[in-house]
Amino acid sequence: MSESLTKVILSVITTNRNRVAGGAPVFFCNDQKEMELFAKNLEAILDGIAHRIGDDVYLIVKHF
């Protein structure tokens, strides 16, 4: 049986250092506006999709 990845977390963007751990590159932002800018730019750079999963966390995910 062959298995393949269908989704990969490329990065995490947050304003709250206590909400995230390792496993993917983490970007810490000073405020909501900066976090949204990082999400928008990383979404384009990494060819992924930004998913807001809370008031202070975005994930950039690659869907295959």
Swiss-Prot record:
Superkingdom of this protein's organism: Bacteria
InterPro entries associated with the record: YpzH (IPR054055)
Protein name: Uncharacterized protein YpzH
Native species: Bacillus subtilis (strain 168)
